[in-house]
Amino acid sequence: MAEIILKGRGISKSFDGIKVLENIDIDIPKGSFTVIMGSSGAGKSTLLYALSGMDKPDLGQIEYKGKSITELSERQMSKLRSEEFGFIFQQIHLVSSLTLFENVTVAGCARKADTADVIKRTEKLFEKMNLSGVRNKLPSAVSGGEGQRAAVARAVIKSPGIVFADEPTGALNRSNTDGVLDLLSGIHNEGQTVLMVTHDMHCALRGDRIIYLDDGHIKGELSLGGFVPADIQRQQRLSDWLAAQGW
């Protein structure tokens, strides 16, 4: 049985008296690519923010690597996020005054890693992600796809326990979307745990495990196994399952 790296029990969250999450139980296995799907307003991003410690739930407990993180102070939680979690958002989160290369190397030093080693690993990442030609450009001077690939590099450079991705391709065209998804699939194949929120079936196909969220409740779960490009049966299986959930 796979080790559970992140666990949530009884997670509930309300905004202005409206329940967004209600009594959610969820396990994230180490090395998995878990996708949380659901329609707009289902509570997907709220659940991701709760699990990552970005927004505390009203009720419930969250454990990371077997230890409770629910009662950590904001300072402790900030340190944990900086050292253990990587984040990719729909809107590209990069420091505007730093070059793409500097954005990634600064993030890589969060664990007080050797600077020379971080630079070497960043160079390898930029080669792998086809960013070497724009490494010295500011975020404002590159395309959306290039910026988001740099954001992926920034998220993984410190070898985080989990990469949290909230609609990471929502602002990209199909070509750039596939480029970012290929990167996420690649790091997952190397053993990285990924938790991604999406409303797009094309993106969800990259996951090996799909959780369907509806009106603040987990309605179903589907195991897809490893991703295989152009797998028609995989696509049909996910499509049929989503239809059964009321998608």
Per-segment meaning from a language model:
Residues 138-142, 146-148:
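Conserved ABC ATPase signature
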Residues 82, 137-140, 158, 190:
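Conserved signature/switch motifs of ABC ATPase nucleotide-binding domains
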Residues 60-68:
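Conserved ABC transporter NBD signature motif
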Residues 68, 105, 116-133:
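Conserved ABC ATPase "signature" region
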Residues 98-107:
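Short coil-to-helix segment of the ABC ATPase nucleotide-binding domain corresponding to the Q-loop/switch region
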Residues 131, 135, 155-156:
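ABC ATPase C-loop
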Residues 52:
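Helix-to-loop junction immediately C-terminal to a conserved catalytic motif
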Residues 163-166:
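Catalytic Walker B motif of ABC-type/P-loop ATPase nucleotide-binding domains
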